[in-house]
Amino acid sequence: MLNENVKKLLKENMWDLATCSAGVPNVVPVALKDVTDDGKLVVGDVFLDTTLRNLAATDGRIAVSVYDAKTLEGYQIRGAAEHVTDGPVVATFKTMVEQMFQGAATAKGALVITPETVIVTTPGASRMGPAPAFCTCLKSLKLFCV
């Protein structure tokens, strides 16, 4: 599903994760992330409490935004997220976080995101229509749905 351009952008830039529950959106920037060989997106869970609550309330529905600030190339990836608390991905994030925060924090788990739709957000590019449930949440705040 993810072509090489999308994977490259995901590996080289920070992401924004968007979730929504009860009409209230939540967006968080993430730097502790990776793309697996099979095209799944993984995010270290350090401070994702609201994100996890929203995912539990919406069957794991999530959107990930990534873009290059210089070229304006960008993508939105929509899919389903699963929270895992053990395994090699979690161990990798735990080591990374403990080193980064010098033992003051640790990863509680990881989100494993299975992409379902990729939308080009690069200015001037053609794109797909909005997902109704996610846009309903955004429209409640009078925000534009791409």
Where are the predicted features?
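Binding-site signature for planar aromatic cofactors or substrates
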Residues: 1-146
